[in-house]
Protein backbone atom coordinates (compact mmCIF):
# COMPACT_ATOMS: atom_id res chain seq x y z
CA UNK A 1 0.00 0.00 0.00
CA UNK A 2 1.27 3.45 -0.94
CA UNK A 3 -0.77 6.60 -0.30
CA UNK A 4 0.09 10.21 -0.92
CA UNK A 5 -0.84 13.71 0.16
CA UNK A 6 -0.32 16.09 -2.74
CA UNK A 7 -0.88 19.73 -1.75
CA UNK A 8 -0.07 22.76 -3.87
CA UNK A 9 2.11 25.30 -2.01
CA UNK A 10 -0.06 28.22 -3.08
CA UNK A 11 -1.42 28.83 0.42
CA UNK A 12 -1.13 27.64 4.00
CA UNK A 13 -2.26 24.19 5.12
CA UNK A 14 -5.94 24.35 6.05
CA UNK A 15 -8.01 21.89 8.05
CA UNK A 16 -9.40 20.22 4.92
CA UNK A 17 -5.93 19.43 3.63
CA UNK A 18 -4.78 18.34 7.08
CA UNK A 19 -7.67 15.87 7.32
CA UNK A 20 -6.85 14.49 3.84
CA UNK A 21 -3.23 14.01 4.90
CA UNK A 22 -4.36 12.31 8.13
CA UNK A 23 -6.68 9.85 6.37
CA UNK A 24 -3.90 8.92 3.91
CA UNK A 25 -1.41 8.54 6.76
CA UNK A 26 -3.74 6.36 8.83
CA UNK A 27 -4.56 4.09 5.91
CA UNK A 28 -0.90 3.62 5.00
CA UNK A 29 0.22 2.93 8.57
CA UNK A 30 -2.65 0.53 9.21
CA UNK A 31 -1.63 -1.52 6.16
CA UNK A 32 2.09 -1.23 6.94
CA UNK A 33 2.56 0.72 3.73
CA UNK A 34 4.21 4.01 2.80
CA UNK A 35 2.83 7.52 3.02
CA UNK A 36 4.29 10.03 0.55
CA UNK A 37 4.24 13.82 0.60
CA UNK A 38 4.25 15.26 -2.90
CA UNK A 39 4.46 19.03 -3.20
CA UNK A 40 2.69 19.92 -6.45
CA UNK A 41 4.56 23.13 -7.18
CA UNK A 42 4.32 23.34 -10.96
CA UNK A 43 2.45 26.67 -10.76
CA UNK A 44 5.62 28.77 -10.68
CA UNK A 45 3.83 32.08 -10.19
CA UNK A 46 1.70 31.10 -7.18
CA UNK A 47 3.88 28.46 -5.50
CA UNK A 48 5.95 29.81 -2.63
CA UNK A 49 8.61 28.25 -0.41
CA UNK A 50 7.02 29.63 2.75
CA UNK A 51 3.79 27.79 1.95
CA UNK A 52 5.70 24.55 1.43
CA UNK A 53 7.37 25.05 4.82
CA UNK A 54 3.98 25.78 6.38
CA UNK A 55 2.61 22.49 5.02
CA UNK A 56 5.60 20.46 6.20
CA UNK A 57 5.61 22.10 9.65
CA UNK A 58 1.86 21.64 9.99
CA UNK A 59 2.10 17.91 9.34
CA UNK A 60 4.99 17.65 11.80
CA UNK A 61 2.95 19.46 14.46
CA UNK A 62 0.15 16.92 14.02
CA UNK A 63 2.61 14.03 14.25
CA UNK A 64 2.07 12.97 10.62
CA UNK A 65 5.38 11.66 9.31
CA UNK A 66 5.95 10.92 5.63
CA UNK A 67 8.23 8.24 4.22
CA UNK A 68 9.43 10.32 1.29
CA UNK A 69 9.11 13.89 0.06
CA UNK A 70 8.77 14.73 -3.64
CA UNK A 71 8.49 18.05 -5.44
CA UNK A 72 6.63 17.90 -8.71
CA UNK A 73 8.77 20.67 -10.19
CA UNK A 74 11.83 18.41 -9.85
CA UNK A 75 10.15 15.77 -12.01
CA UNK A 76 9.45 17.94 -15.07
CA UNK A 77 11.65 15.81 -17.35
CA UNK A 78 9.60 12.69 -16.58
CA UNK A 79 6.36 14.53 -17.37
CA UNK A 80 7.86 15.88 -20.60
CA UNK A 81 9.07 12.41 -21.68
CA UNK A 82 5.63 10.92 -21.12
CA UNK A 83 3.98 13.75 -23.03
CA UNK A 84 6.33 13.25 -25.96
CA UNK A 85 5.53 9.53 -26.05
CA UNK A 86 1.81 10.32 -26.17
CA UNK A 87 2.40 12.71 -29.09
CA UNK A 88 4.58 10.17 -30.91
CA UNK A 89 1.83 7.55 -30.57
CA UNK A 90 -0.84 9.94 -31.80
CA UNK A 91 -2.57 10.00 -28.42
CA UNK A 92 -1.93 13.73 -27.95
CA UNK A 93 -1.55 16.57 -30.42
CA UNK A 94 -0.76 20.25 -30.66
CA UNK A 95 -3.80 22.44 -31.21
CA UNK A 96 -4.55 26.07 -31.70
CA UNK A 97 -5.94 27.91 -28.72
CA UNK A 98 -7.95 31.11 -28.70
CA UNK A 99 -10.23 32.68 -31.24
CA UNK A 100 -7.37 34.05 -33.31
CA UNK A 101 -5.46 30.78 -33.22
CA UNK A 102 -2.33 32.53 -31.99
CA UNK A 103 -1.82 30.24 -29.01
CA UNK A 104 -0.85 26.59 -28.99
CA UNK A 105 -1.69 23.90 -26.44
CA UNK A 106 -1.38 20.12 -26.36
CA UNK A 107 -4.60 18.15 -26.12
CA UNK A 108 -5.21 14.51 -25.28
CA UNK A 109 -7.04 12.60 -28.01
CA UNK A 110 -10.07 11.42 -26.06
CA UNK A 111 -11.30 7.98 -27.23
CA UNK A 112 -14.74 8.85 -25.83
CA UNK A 113 -15.02 5.72 -23.72
CA UNK A 114 -17.51 5.12 -20.95
CA UNK A 115 -15.63 4.80 -17.70
CA UNK A 116 -16.67 3.26 -14.41
CA UNK A 117 -14.63 2.89 -11.27
CA UNK A 118 -15.29 1.70 -7.74
CA UNK A 119 -14.89 4.39 -5.13
CA UNK A 120 -14.03 2.91 -1.72
CA UNK A 121 -16.45 5.35 -0.07
CA UNK A 122 -19.11 6.02 -2.71
CA UNK A 123 -19.35 2.73 -4.57
CA UNK A 124 -19.50 2.50 -8.38
CA UNK A 125 -19.25 5.76 -10.31
CA UNK A 126 -19.73 6.04 -14.08
CA UNK A 127 -18.76 8.75 -16.58
CA UNK A 128 -19.36 9.22 -20.29
CA UNK A 129 -16.06 10.80 -21.28
CA UNK A 130 -17.30 11.96 -24.70
CA UNK A 131 -18.57 15.03 -22.85
CA UNK A 132 -15.00 15.94 -21.93
CA UNK A 133 -13.83 16.39 -25.51
CA UNK A 134 -10.12 16.45 -26.27
CA UNK A 135 -8.93 18.04 -23.04
CA UNK A 136 -5.74 20.08 -22.60
CA UNK A 137 -2.84 18.23 -20.93
CA UNK A 138 -0.02 20.75 -21.49
CA UNK A 139 0.58 24.39 -22.37
CA UNK A 140 3.49 23.19 -24.50
CA UNK A 141 5.97 20.31 -24.55
CA UNK A 142 7.87 21.82 -21.61
CA UNK A 143 4.83 22.60 -19.48
CA UNK A 144 2.59 19.59 -18.78
CA UNK A 145 -0.47 20.46 -16.70
CA UNK A 146 -2.09 19.02 -13.59
CA UNK A 147 -3.78 15.87 -14.90
CA UNK A 148 -0.78 14.51 -16.78
CA UNK A 149 1.69 15.32 -14.00
CA UNK A 150 -0.51 13.64 -11.38
CA UNK A 151 -0.97 10.48 -13.45
CA UNK A 152 2.75 10.16 -14.25
CA UNK A 153 3.77 10.75 -10.64
CA UNK A 154 1.20 8.37 -9.13
CA UNK A 155 2.32 5.69 -11.60
CA UNK A 156 6.06 6.08 -11.03
CA UNK A 157 5.69 6.38 -7.26
CA UNK A 158 3.59 3.23 -7.12
CA UNK A 159 0.59 4.91 -5.50
CA UNK A 160 -2.07 2.28 -4.84
CA UNK A 161 -4.73 4.34 -3.03
CA UNK A 162 -5.76 7.88 -3.93
CA UNK A 163 -7.64 9.32 -0.95
CA UNK A 164 -8.71 12.89 -1.64
CA UNK A 165 -11.59 15.36 -1.40
CA UNK A 166 -14.84 14.81 -3.26
CA UNK A 167 -14.15 17.96 -5.30
CA UNK A 168 -11.66 15.80 -7.23
CA UNK A 169 -14.29 13.29 -8.43
CA UNK A 170 -14.66 15.16 -11.72
CA UNK A 171 -10.90 14.87 -12.29
CA UNK A 172 -10.96 11.09 -12.05
CA UNK A 173 -12.26 10.19 -15.57
CA UNK A 174 -9.57 12.32 -17.23
CA UNK A 175 -6.91 10.70 -15.10
CA UNK A 176 -8.20 7.19 -15.79
CA UNK A 177 -8.08 7.90 -19.54
CA UNK A 178 -4.47 9.06 -19.22
CA UNK A 179 -3.57 6.03 -17.09
CA UNK A 180 -4.88 3.73 -19.81
CA UNK A 181 -2.96 5.68 -22.45
CA UNK A 182 0.39 5.21 -20.68
CA UNK A 183 -0.41 1.62 -19.58
CA UNK A 184 -0.50 2.56 -15.90
CA UNK A 185 -2.60 0.59 -13.40
CA UNK A 186 -5.64 2.32 -11.93
CA UNK A 187 -5.25 3.04 -8.21
CA UNK A 188 -8.15 2.59 -5.82
CA UNK A 189 -9.99 5.87 -5.35
CA UNK A 190 -11.66 7.13 -2.19
CA UNK A 191 -13.23 10.58 -2.28
CA UNK A 192 -13.84 11.92 1.21
CA UNK A 193 -16.64 14.42 1.97
CA UNK A 194 -16.06 18.15 2.00
CA UNK A 195 -15.84 19.90 5.35
CA UNK A 196 -18.85 22.15 5.83
CA UNK A 197 -19.49 25.11 8.10
CA UNK A 198 -22.38 25.19 10.58
CA UNK A 199 -24.62 26.67 7.86
CA UNK A 200 -23.76 23.67 5.64
CA UNK A 201 -21.87 25.79 3.13
CA UNK A 202 -18.29 24.90 2.25
CA UNK A 203 -15.97 25.87 5.11
CA UNK A 204 -14.04 29.04 4.29
CA UNK A 205 -12.28 31.99 5.93
CA UNK A 206 -15.57 33.83 6.35
CA UNK A 207 -16.55 31.21 8.94
CA UNK A 208 -13.45 31.92 11.07
CA UNK A 209 -10.15 30.09 11.38
CA UNK A 210 -9.46 27.49 8.71
CA UNK A 211 -5.66 27.32 8.58
CA UNK A 212 -3.95 24.78 10.80
CA UNK A 213 -1.41 27.30 12.11
CA UNK A 214 -4.24 29.50 13.45
CA UNK A 215 -5.51 26.64 15.59
CA UNK A 216 -1.99 25.90 16.79
CA UNK A 217 -1.43 29.54 17.72
CA UNK A 218 -4.73 29.67 19.59
CA UNK A 219 -3.43 26.96 21.87
CA UNK A 220 -5.15 23.83 20.61
CA UNK A 221 -3.15 20.67 21.29
CA UNK A 222 -1.99 18.58 18.32
CA UNK A 223 -3.42 15.38 19.81
CA UNK A 224 -6.83 17.04 20.15
CA UNK A 225 -6.63 18.38 16.60
CA UNK A 226 -5.77 14.93 15.19
CA UNK A 227 -8.66 13.38 17.14
CA UNK A 228 -11.03 16.09 15.91
CA UNK A 229 -9.96 15.88 12.25
CA UNK A 230 -10.40 12.10 12.27
CA UNK A 231 -13.99 12.46 13.45
CA UNK A 232 -14.95 14.90 10.68
CA UNK A 233 -16.69 12.46 8.38
CA UNK A 234 -15.42 9.20 9.90
CA UNK A 235 -17.48 7.27 12.43
CA UNK A 236 -15.81 4.77 14.77
CA UNK A 237 -17.58 1.53 15.58
CA UNK A 238 -18.08 2.13 19.29
CA UNK A 239 -19.37 5.12 21.23
CA UNK A 240 -15.93 6.37 22.28
CA UNK A 241 -14.70 9.75 21.06
CA UNK A 242 -11.15 10.01 22.39
CA UNK A 243 -8.58 8.47 20.04
CA UNK A 244 -4.81 8.74 20.10
CA UNK A 245 -2.91 8.48 16.83
CA UNK A 246 -2.13 4.84 17.63
CA UNK A 247 -5.82 4.18 18.31
CA UNK A 248 -6.75 5.73 14.98
CA UNK A 249 -4.21 3.63 13.08
CA UNK A 250 -5.93 0.54 14.50
CA UNK A 251 -9.53 1.73 14.13
CA UNK A 252 -9.68 3.79 10.93
CA UNK A 253 -11.44 2.33 7.89
CA UNK A 254 -12.61 3.95 4.66
CA UNK A 255 -15.84 1.95 4.90
CA UNK A 256 -16.92 4.06 7.88
CA UNK A 257 -16.31 7.40 6.14
CA UNK A 258 -19.60 9.09 5.27
CA UNK A 259 -20.54 10.25 1.77
CA UNK A 260 -22.27 13.50 2.68
CA UNK A 261 -20.60 16.70 3.81
CA UNK A 262 -19.12 16.71 7.31
CA UNK A 263 -19.78 19.63 9.68
CA UNK A 264 -16.87 21.46 11.31
CA UNK A 265 -18.10 21.75 14.91
CA UNK A 266 -15.88 24.15 16.86
CA UNK A 267 -17.68 23.28 20.11
CA UNK A 268 -16.64 19.65 19.61
CA UNK A 269 -13.03 20.74 19.06
CA UNK A 270 -13.13 22.83 22.24
CA UNK A 271 -14.52 19.88 24.20
CA UNK A 272 -11.85 17.54 22.87
CA UNK A 273 -9.12 20.05 23.63
CA UNK A 274 -10.36 20.38 27.22
CA UNK A 275 -10.26 16.61 27.60
CA UNK A 276 -6.67 16.46 26.35
CA UNK A 277 -5.63 19.35 28.58
CA UNK A 278 -6.99 17.45 31.58
CA UNK A 279 -5.07 14.34 30.51
CA UNK A 280 -1.74 16.17 30.51
CA UNK A 281 0.69 15.37 33.31
CA UNK A 282 0.67 18.18 35.90
CA UNK A 283 4.29 19.12 35.24
CA UNK A 284 3.63 19.29 31.48
CA UNK A 285 0.62 21.52 31.97
CA UNK A 286 2.56 23.76 34.36
CA UNK A 287 5.16 24.31 31.61
CA UNK A 288 2.36 25.33 29.26
CA UNK A 289 0.97 27.73 31.86
CA UNK A 290 4.39 29.41 32.15
CA UNK A 291 4.62 29.59 28.35
CA UNK A 292 1.27 31.36 28.04
CA UNK A 293 1.50 33.74 31.01
CA UNK A 294 2.01 37.26 29.58
CA UNK A 295 5.56 38.57 30.00
CA UNK A 296 4.56 41.41 32.32
CA UNK A 297 3.52 38.84 34.92
CA UNK A 298 6.95 37.21 34.83
CA UNK A 299 8.82 40.26 36.16
CA UNK A 300 10.67 39.94 39.46
CA UNK A 301 8.07 41.93 41.40
CA UNK A 302 5.30 39.67 40.12
CA UNK A 303 7.15 36.39 39.93
CA UNK A 304 5.03 33.31 40.51
CA UNK A 305 6.49 30.77 42.92
CA UNK A 306 6.55 27.07 42.13
CA UNK A 307 3.83 26.44 44.73
CA UNK A 308 1.70 29.21 43.27
CA UNK A 309 2.15 27.77 39.79
CA UNK A 310 1.03 24.29 40.80
CA UNK A 311 -2.13 25.61 42.42
CA UNK A 312 -2.94 28.11 39.68
CA UNK A 313 -2.59 25.29 37.16
CA UNK A 314 -5.20 23.27 39.06
CA UNK A 315 -7.66 26.16 38.71
CA UNK A 316 -6.87 26.96 35.10
CA UNK A 317 -7.10 23.44 33.67
CA UNK A 318 -10.77 23.21 34.66
CA UNK A 319 -11.70 26.54 33.11
CA UNK A 320 -10.08 26.82 29.69
CA UNK A 321 -10.76 25.53 26.20
CA UNK A 322 -7.37 26.40 24.74
CA UNK A 323 -3.97 27.40 26.05
CA UNK A 324 -4.41 30.95 24.75
CA UNK A 325 -7.26 31.30 27.28
CA UNK A 326 -4.51 31.36 29.93
CA UNK A 327 -3.14 34.62 28.52
CA UNK A 328 -6.65 36.06 28.32
CA UNK A 329 -7.36 35.20 31.96
CA UNK A 330 -4.24 37.02 33.14
CA UNK A 331 -4.74 40.00 30.82
CA UNK A 332 -8.35 40.43 31.97
CA UNK A 333 -7.18 40.91 35.55
CA UNK A 334 -8.67 37.65 36.76
CA UNK A 335 -5.49 36.81 38.69
CA UNK A 336 -4.49 40.32 39.77
CA UNK A 337 -5.25 39.39 43.38
CA UNK A 338 -2.27 37.03 43.31
CA UNK A 339 0.16 39.88 42.76
CA UNK A 340 -1.51 42.76 44.61
CA UNK A 341 -3.41 42.84 47.87
CA UNK A 342 -6.99 43.81 47.18
CA UNK A 343 -8.68 46.92 48.54
CA UNK A 344 -12.43 46.98 49.02
CA UNK A 345 -15.41 48.32 50.93
CA UNK A 346 -15.51 46.34 54.23
CA UNK A 347 -19.27 45.90 53.84
CA UNK A 348 -18.56 43.47 51.00
CA UNK A 349 -17.07 41.10 53.56
CA UNK A 350 -20.53 40.53 55.00
CA UNK A 351 -22.46 37.45 53.95
CA UNK A 352 -26.14 37.76 53.00
CA UNK A 353 -28.28 38.80 55.93
CA UNK A 354 -25.30 39.29 58.26
CA UNK A 355 -25.33 43.00 59.14
CA UNK A 356 -23.13 42.57 62.20
CA UNK A 357 -19.55 43.59 61.36
CA UNK A 358 -18.29 42.46 64.74
CA UNK A 359 -19.58 38.91 64.28
CA UNK A 360 -17.95 38.72 60.86
CA UNK A 361 -14.68 39.97 62.38
CA UNK A 362 -14.85 37.28 65.08
CA UNK A 363 -15.31 34.62 62.42
CA UNK A 364 -12.33 35.89 60.44
CA UNK A 365 -10.25 35.92 63.63
CA UNK A 366 -11.17 32.29 64.24
CA UNK A 367 -10.13 31.39 60.68
CA UNK A 368 -6.80 33.15 61.29
CA UNK A 369 -6.34 31.14 64.47
CA UNK A 370 -7.06 27.87 62.65
CA UNK A 371 -4.75 28.62 59.71
CA UNK A 372 -1.85 29.37 62.04
CA UNK A 373 -1.92 25.70 63.05
CA UNK A 374 -1.13 24.49 59.52
CA UNK A 375 2.49 23.68 58.68
CA UNK A 376 3.56 25.67 55.59
CA UNK A 377 5.11 22.55 54.06
CA UNK A 378 1.76 20.73 54.21
CA UNK A 379 -0.27 23.65 52.90
CA UNK A 380 -2.69 22.48 50.22
CA UNK A 381 -6.28 23.25 49.39
CA UNK A 382 -7.26 19.97 51.03
CA UNK A 383 -5.41 20.64 54.30
CA UNK A 384 -6.93 24.12 54.53
CA UNK A 385 -10.40 22.68 53.96
CA UNK A 386 -9.87 20.00 56.62
CA UNK A 387 -8.79 22.69 59.08
CA UNK A 388 -11.61 25.17 58.49
CA UNK A 389 -14.55 23.01 57.39
CA UNK A 390 -15.81 21.88 60.78
CA UNK A 391 -15.90 25.42 62.12
CA UNK A 392 -17.52 26.76 58.94
CA UNK A 393 -20.20 24.07 59.11
CA UNK A 394 -21.03 24.93 62.72
CA UNK A 395 -21.31 28.69 62.10
CA UNK A 396 -22.82 28.55 58.65
CA UNK A 397 -20.60 27.93 55.66
CA UNK A 398 -21.48 31.12 53.84
CA UNK A 399 -21.02 33.18 57.01
CA UNK A 400 -17.43 31.93 57.35
CA UNK A 401 -16.27 31.10 53.85
CA UNK A 402 -17.61 34.20 52.06
CA UNK A 403 -15.66 36.77 54.13
CA UNK A 404 -12.63 34.47 54.05
CA UNK A 405 -12.74 34.26 50.24
CA UNK A 406 -13.43 37.96 49.72
CA UNK A 407 -10.65 38.95 52.12
CA UNK A 408 -8.18 36.85 50.14
CA UNK A 409 -9.21 37.86 46.61
CA UNK A 410 -11.28 41.03 46.81
CA UNK A 411 -13.53 39.44 44.18
CA UNK A 412 -17.10 38.20 44.26
CA UNK A 413 -16.12 35.47 41.82
CA UNK A 414 -12.89 33.61 42.49
CA UNK A 415 -11.65 30.12 43.37
CA UNK A 416 -12.79 28.73 46.71
CA UNK A 417 -10.97 30.07 49.80
CA UNK A 418 -9.09 26.83 50.40
CA UNK A 419 -7.47 27.01 46.97
CA UNK A 420 -6.79 30.72 47.43
CA UNK A 421 -4.82 30.03 50.61
CA UNK A 422 -2.82 27.33 48.82
CA UNK A 423 -1.97 29.79 46.01
CA UNK A 424 -1.10 32.78 48.19
CA UNK A 425 0.70 30.82 50.88
CA UNK A 426 0.22 30.87 54.63
CA UNK A 427 2.00 34.14 55.39
CA UNK A 428 0.31 36.22 52.68
CA UNK A 429 -3.09 34.69 53.43
CA UNK A 430 -2.81 35.57 57.12
CA UNK A 431 -1.80 39.15 56.26
CA UNK A 432 -4.88 39.58 54.08
CA UNK A 433 -7.21 38.06 56.65
CA UNK A 434 -5.78 40.30 59.39
CA UNK A 435 -6.20 43.33 57.15
CA UNK A 436 -9.84 42.38 56.58
CA UNK A 437 -10.37 42.00 60.32
CA UNK A 438 -8.84 45.44 60.95
CA UNK A 439 -11.02 47.11 58.30
CA UNK A 440 -14.09 45.72 60.03
CA UNK A 441 -12.93 47.26 63.33
CA UNK A 442 -12.39 50.60 61.62
CA UNK A 443 -15.79 50.40 59.99
CA UNK A 444 -17.48 49.50 63.26
CA UNK A 445 -15.89 52.34 65.25
Label every PLM stretch briefly:
Residues 1-97, 171-184:
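N-terminal Rossmann-like or analogous alpha/beta NTP/dinucleotide-binding catalytic cores
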Residues 375-440:
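Charged substrate- and nucleic-acid-binding regions of tRNA-handling and nucleotidyl-transfer enzymes
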Residues 441-445:
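Short, basic, low-complexity termini and linkers enriched in Ser/Thr/Gly/Pro
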Residues 24, 55, 86, 108, ...:
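Residue-level signal for inorganic ion chemistry
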Residues 29-41, 149-161, 182-196, 415-420, ...:
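Glycine-rich phosphate/pyrophosphate-binding loops
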Residues 72, 88-205, 211-215, 236, ...:
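Active-site cores that bind ATP or allylic diphosphates and position pyrophosphate for catalysis
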Residues 139, 157-168, 196-228, 232-241, ...:
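Conserved phosphate-binding loops in nucleotide/dinucleotide-binding enzymes
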Residues 282, 286-393:
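Small-residue-rich helix-loop
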Amino acid sequence: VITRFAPSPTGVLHVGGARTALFNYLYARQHEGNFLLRIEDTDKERSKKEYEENIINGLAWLGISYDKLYRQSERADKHKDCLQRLINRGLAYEAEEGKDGSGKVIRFRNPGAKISFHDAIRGNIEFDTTELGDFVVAKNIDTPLFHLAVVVDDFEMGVTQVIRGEDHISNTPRQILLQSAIDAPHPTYAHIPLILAHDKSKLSKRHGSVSLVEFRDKGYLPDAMVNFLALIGWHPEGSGELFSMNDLVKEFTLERVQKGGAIFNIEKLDWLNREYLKKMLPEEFEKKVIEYIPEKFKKSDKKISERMLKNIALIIVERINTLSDISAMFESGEFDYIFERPTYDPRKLLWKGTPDLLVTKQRLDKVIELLQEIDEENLTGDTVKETVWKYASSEGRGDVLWPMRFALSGKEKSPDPFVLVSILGKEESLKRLRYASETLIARNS
